[in-house]
């Protein structure tokens, strides 16, 4: 299916590009989430009429993400979990825990924006995680996990 992208989509294309994707991906994800429209002649004409407005909105989102990224960059998140004597946690620290703590600190972060490179954190100590604020803005955050004896 040919679609017009209304937003930048990772590994697919930028705003305004006409790309061919599988029907299910377009029908079940891209079109319902508002990231794309079918590439019919009517939709192409409508997109060209709104192109400047959509580009302005995309630039505003990017600027907002960059501003938040500058504030968030280098932040340290401190979490306390129950741990054994050897430094292994009973349970783990997930992206949900990190996003929750960042929200308590005043940042508006969804758990899907937190990227744990090697899965959940299962040991006491410092780890570096990525927070994807925008497709073009990825910030590194340090997570310090402290052990709490049971």
UniProtKB/Swiss-Prot annotation:
<dbReference type="GO" id="GO:0005840">
    <property type="term" value="C:ribosome"/>
</dbReference>
<dbReference type="InterPro" id="IPR036935">
    <property type="entry name" value="Ribosomal_bL9_N_sf"/>
</dbReference>
<keyword id="KW-0687">Ribonucleoprotein</keyword>
<dbReference type="InterPro" id="IPR009027">
    <property type="entry name" value="Ribosomal_bL9/RNase_H1_N"/>
</dbReference>
<dbReference type="InterPro" id="IPR036791">
    <property type="entry name" value="Ribosomal_bL9_C_sf"/>
</dbReference>
<dbReference type="InterPro" id="IPR020069">
    <property type="entry name" value="Ribosomal_bL9_C"/>
</dbReference>
<dbReference type="Pfam" id="PF01281">
    <property type="entry name" value="Ribosomal_L9_N"/>
</dbReference>
<dbReference type="GO" id="GO:0006412">
    <property type="term" value="P:translation"/>
</dbReference>
<dbReference type="InterPro" id="IPR020594">
    <property type="entry name" value="Ribosomal_bL9_bac/chp"/>
</dbReference>
<dbReference type="GO" id="GO:0019843">
    <property type="term" value="F:rRNA binding"/>
</dbReference>
<dbReference type="GO" id="GO:1990904">
    <property type="term" value="C:ribonucleoprotein complex"/>
</dbReference>
<keyword id="KW-0689">Ribosomal protein</keyword>
<dbReference type="InterPro" id="IPR000244">
    <property type="entry name" value="Ribosomal_bL9"/>
</dbReference>
<dbReference type="Pfam" id="PF03948">
    <property type="entry name" value="Ribosomal_L9_C"/>
</dbReference>
<keyword id="KW-0694">RNA-binding</keyword>
<dbReference type="InterPro" id="IPR020070">
    <property type="entry name" value="Ribosomal_bL9_N"/>
</dbReference>
<comment type="similarity">
    <text>Belongs to the bacterial ribosomal protein bL9 family.</text>
</comment>
<comment type="function">
    <text>Binds to the 23S rRNA.</text>
</comment>
<keyword id="KW-0699">rRNA-binding</keyword>
<protein>
    <recommendedName>
        <fullName>Large ribosomal subunit protein bL9</fullName>
    </recommendedName>
</protein>
<dbReference type="GO" id="GO:0003735">
    <property type="term" value="F:structural constituent of ribosome"/>
</dbReference>
């Amino acid at each position: 299916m040919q679609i017009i992208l209304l937003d930048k989509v990772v590994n697919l294309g930028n705003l305004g590009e006409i790309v061919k994707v599988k029907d299910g991906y377009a029908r079940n994800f891209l079109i319902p989430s508002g990231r794309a429209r079918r590439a019919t002649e009517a939709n192409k004409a409508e997109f060209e009429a709104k192109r400047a407005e959509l580009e302005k909105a995309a630039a505003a989102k990017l600027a907002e993400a960059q501003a938040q990224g500058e504030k968030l960059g280098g932040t340290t998140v401190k979490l306390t979990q129950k741990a054994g004597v050897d430094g292994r946690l009973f349970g783990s620290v997930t992206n949900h825990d990190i996003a929750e703590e960042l929200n308590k600190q005043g940042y508006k972060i969804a758990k899907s924006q937190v990227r744990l490179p090697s899965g959940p954190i299962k040991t006491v100590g410092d780890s570096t995680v990525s927070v994807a604020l925008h497709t073009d803005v990825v910030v590194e955050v340090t997570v310090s996990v402290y052990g709490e004896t049971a």
